[in-house]
């Protein structure tokens, strides 16, 4: 059985810039920011 990777919890939090204004036209067909809540 391969060893489990440790999940880094604080690394995805530093993406706090305002990307939402610049990439808003890309995500109109596919709401990417909606899948933030993940169960583990």
From Swiss-Prot:
Q: Which GO terms describe its molecular function?
A: DNA binding
- Recite the UniProt keywords alphabetically: Chromosome, Developmental protein, Differentiation, DNA condensation, DNA-binding, Nucleosome core, Nucleus, Spermatogenesis
**Where in the cell is the protein located?**
Nucleus; Chromosome
Is DNA-binding one of the keywords? yes
UniProt record, GO biological process: cell differentiation; chromosome condensation; spermatogenesis
GO CC annotation, single: nucleosome
Expressed, tissue-wise, as follows:
Testis.
Question: Which branch of life, at top level?
Answer: Eukaryota
Q: Cite the residue spans of the region called Disordered.
A: 1-40
Summarize the protein's role: Protamines substitute for histones in the chromatin of sperm during the haploid phase of spermatogenesis. They compact sperm DNA into a highly condensed, stable and inactive complex.
* Protein name in the entry: Protamine-1
Q: Which organism is it from?
A: Bufo japonicus (Japanese common toad)
Q: Which gene encodes it?
A: PBP1
